[in-house]
Amino acid sequence: MVQISEVKGNGRDNRITTHSHIKGLGLKEDGTCESVGGGFIGQEKAREACGIITDLIKSKKFGGKGVLFAGGAGTGKTALALAIAQELGPKVPFCPMVGSEVYSSEIKKTEALMENFRRAIGLRVKETKEVYEGEVTEMVPEEAENPLGGYGKTISHVLLGLKTHKGTKQLKLDPSIYESLQREQVSTGDVIYIEANTGAVKRVGRSDAYATEFDLEAEEYVPMPKGEVHKRKEIVQDVTLHDLDIANARPQGGQDIMSMMGQLMKPKKTEITDKLRGEINKVVNKYIEQGIAELIPGVLFIDEVHMLDIECFTYLNQALESTISPIVIFASNRGICTIRGTEDIQAPHGIPTDLLDRLLIVRTLPYSESEIRSILQIRAKVENIILTDECLDKLAQEGSRTSLRYVIQLLTPVSIIASLHGNKEIGVQDIEECNDLFLDARRSAQVVKSSSGFLQ
């Protein structure tokens, strides 16, 4: 009997994360929203407010402004920020960070903030390039007497024939391009393109007219290019200002032994100077004026903003008012608390009032029991877990008593317990067993209180 077996692909399954079920804000065309949409349950006012913010970002009328998501733990502040990122699409830069990220022994706090600011500002560069593209029909190097004397001869120029469906052209190329042709191992029958401005050569592949040839080396066969040999191509590149900073702060190169040793050693984080950033800003502004580039203000999301200190907040006041600035979204789950870095100055959300005045504040509300039930239903579907109505009710009650995060974290352990019992569906007894194994924050605190005499 012939044995046939299926080969499993080696591609990894997408990891299920806390916000895997969030697909967007779930708004209608008129900007209003229903209670269920885009993976969200409830928070209608907050989602509608985020919809308006998204429209302002898309129309580029919201640069250098700030938004604060204020609400209790587990009310969907991070989910709203991720939904805004998904609504904006992959072309708009979105840079998430946590307030405690700025504290480092290598670079200053303000430098870490500015790095993330620059990561959240995109630059779309449009460049029109003249290229010669086609199948190589001939490649003849022309030799001449060596101008430096001696017996050897040098290559004065190269005659290159290129063919497309529309016609053929013979080009007379510089000897430096011949070196590039040799480096790319170009031969007759290859499809190549040459940039007219830089002389860069790129071998696309072998022409499909030669596909019947027997070759030991695996070749990529490509069709003969359409259109003329000489054509203009518009190339669009998306970069962030931080990419430009890094490229200029750490230029690669140097063939001496010290340069090579420096590359082998563990690189220390480079602090980019304000002078360098100023020079890059000048070049960027020049490109924007010439119409070569377009500035795309993205979104910087700072979670747990109360972890920043008074120095960072003072710096943020200045950074928000600069000409090149992204949209900054803050999130905090604190009420009235002491501003970090001060001894007795208290402020709402741990943010100084002068910065709070500059922000639009969006409030997120705690979830009701029915909303927790609906969220659990969506999460169970994402994680491929089958829950009965009784189990959903039980978990929703548990969620309103403890927290939404706790019951979401229970879903996977409960499904494992049910499978150990040989059940496909999760039962109430599985939830109770899981409850006994894993404590929530309140029960854990009670245990610590009752055993304070034993635990030191």
UniProtKB/Swiss-Prot annotation:
Signal sequence coordinates: none
Subcellular location: Nucleus
Record-linked SUPFAM superfamilies: P-loop containing nucleoside triphosphate hydrolases
InterPro entries the record matches: AAA+_ATPase, P-loop_NTPase, RuvB-like, RuvB-like_C, RuvBL1/2_DNA/RNA_bd_dom, TIP49_P-loop
GO MF, any single term: ATP binding
Annotated positions binding ATP: G71, G72, A73, G74, T75, G76, K77, T78
Assigned GO CC terms: cytosol; Ino80 complex; NuA4 histone acetyltransferase complex; nucleus; R2TP complex; Swr1 complex
Role summary: DNA helicase which participates in several chromatin remodeling complexes, including the SWR1 and the INO80 complexes. The SWR1 complex mediates the ATP-dependent exchange of histone H2A for the H2A variant HZT1 leading to transcriptional regulation of selected genes by chromatin remodeling. The INO80 complex remodels chromatin by shifting nucleosomes and is involved in DNA repair. Also involved in pre-rRNA processing.
Record-given protein name: RuvB-like helicase 1
Organism encoding this protein: Schizosaccharomyces pombe (strain 972 / ATCC 24843)
